Amino acid sequence: MECKEDLTIVIDNGSGMCKAGFAGYDAPHAVFPSIVGRPRHTGVMVGMGQKDSYIGDEAQSKRDILNLKFPVERGIITNWNDMEEIWHHTFYNELRVAPEEHPVLLTEPPLNSKANREKMPQIMFETFNTPAMYVAIQAVLSLYASGRATGVILDSGDGVSYTVPVYEGNTFPLSITRLHLAGGDLTDYMSRLLYTDCGYYFSTKAEKEIVKDIKEKLAYVALDFEAEMQTAASSPSLEKSYKLPDGRMITIGNERFRCPEALFQPSLLAMDYDGIHETTYNSIMKCDVDFHKDLYGNVLLSGGSTMFPGIADRMNKELTALAPSTMKIKIIAPPERKYSAWIGGSILASLSSFQPRWISKEEYDESGPSIVHRKCW
């Protein structure tokens, strides 16, 4: 079916943030926390225009009187009723559109279950009455955003990290690796480091947001972890100050690079996983040997937890040590990679060649939810 590109809605549902906007734009219009909050005690907020539920930033700001739910856990939608609320909020409050008037492109994690894949078109067509929809894998969209059809994507967000080899637009499920280590774990680790090393105690949800901000503003990846530890021990040159909301200043030293080091050494979090350099290498090694050269030459970083300064140089160093000496390693770290899955969706939905790939309402009514397996791959 033919769809007006400029009115197509693109929604990237992450564990931490929901990114939403219109195809053809180079950035999402709305980015808000993937949170649904409900009053702990009905009646507490009567007279304050109490609502049954609060979404995103509003839920975050009222967190002291709400029970917060996170419908996307480790990248996977686990609570469909709450997810429906987030989508409703996205359409009517954030984008201010009627979903029955716009095609919708949704993102999904690699290796998404059959049942989860079918639930998305079911809700879009039966609840929101959209005229057309499509489901695309986040990592593949990130690759499209970089103008490539071949590469291995290291996608690390708030809840989960994946390494996904793609060749000429095709994924290889057996070579995809999934790592239950991402931004949320790093924020928790930074909390622990600040407490054990510096005596700063951040316990409430509001204080967790402060730790997240410290991580995002001050953390970086060391090229050589042991050497950086020695530098930090012998001089204050790596220390940075951070101003807390109450005006107090705190000083942060080696925690700045010890926190994201866990991506390369999950054992720091007592996790028995390979680091992101090893999962990337392992994913490539599981692919046909003829693809290796193109994959090593196109290692793409995507997602908010790849935004640490120094991560690309460190990945290059670690992969060079693992790969055959004849292989040329190239790490691609686009500046807008925090939103690259959304940007890829925006590009894909705008292509005239993509238009026949939409699942139309008529096709859904005829075939049911299983049509998603036939049309979205």
Curated annotation (Swiss-Prot):
Q: Which organism is it from?
A: Dictyostelium discoideum (Social amoeba)
Localization (cell): Cytoplasm, Cytoskeleton
What's the EC number here?
Answer: 3.6.4.-
**Biological role:** Actins are highly conserved proteins that are involved in various types of cell motility and are ubiquitously expressed in all eukaryotic cells. Multiple isoforms are involved in various cellular functions such as cytoskeleton structure, cell mobility, chromosome movement and muscle contraction.
Q: What are the top taxonomic ranks of the organism?
A: Eukaryota, Amoebozoa, Evosea, Eumycetozoa, Dictyostelia
Under what name is this protein listed?
Putative actin-24
Instruction: Give the main EC class.
Output: hydrolase
Coiled coil ranges = none
Task: Note the InterPro entries from the entry.
Answer: Actin (IPR004000), Actin/actin-like_CS (IPR020902), Actin_CS (IPR004001), ATPase_NBD (IPR043129)
Indicate the family of this protein: Belongs to the actin family.
- Give yes or no: UniProt keyword Iron: no
Principal location class = cytoplasm
One GO molecular function term of this record is: myosin binding
Q: Spell out the Pfam families in the cross-references.
A: Actin (PF00022)
Question: Superkingdom of this entry's organism?
Answer: Eukaryota
Q: Where is the signal peptide?
A: none
| Catalysed reaction, written as an equation | ATP + H2O = ADP + phosphate + H(+)
**What GO cellular component entries does it have?**
actin cytoskeleton; cytoplasm
Keyword annotations for this protein, in alphabetical order, are:
ATP-binding, Cytoplasm, Cytoskeleton, Hydrolase, Nucleotide-binding
Q: Where are the transmembrane segments?
A: none
Q: Which SMART domains match?
A: ACTIN
